[in-house]
């Protein structure tokens, strides 16, 4: 049986863009969401392997935005 491999892209968190639009500090956002500034930094830099839907909802509430405002899908380069 032949194996099929599908190249996947990546999900980018545009938290820094929303922070600038809202004139908010990373530490303030972390406090509103209820996570440590270190964990918020992991999300912001794209080093997180997963994010809970509840955390995404809290981010949207704190930033007054929709998930699509902070998430972006980039296709894998071929």
Locations of regions flagged by a protein language model:
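Residues within the helices of the helix-turn-helix
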Residues: 16, 27, 57
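Residue-level recognition of specific faces of alpha-helices
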Residues: 39-42, 55, 69
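A short, Lys/Arg-rich alpha-helix, primarily the initiator
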Residues: 1-24
């Amino acid at each position: 049986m032949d194996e099929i491999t599908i190249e996947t892209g990546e999900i980018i968190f545009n938290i820094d863009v929303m922070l600038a639009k809202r004139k908010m500090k990373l530490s303030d956002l972390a406090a509103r969401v209820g996570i440590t500034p270190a964990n918020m930094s992991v999300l912001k830099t794209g080093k997180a392997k997963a994010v809970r839907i509840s955390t995404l909802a809290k981010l949207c509430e704190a930033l007054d935005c929709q998930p699509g405002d902070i998430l972006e899908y980039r296709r894998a380069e071929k």
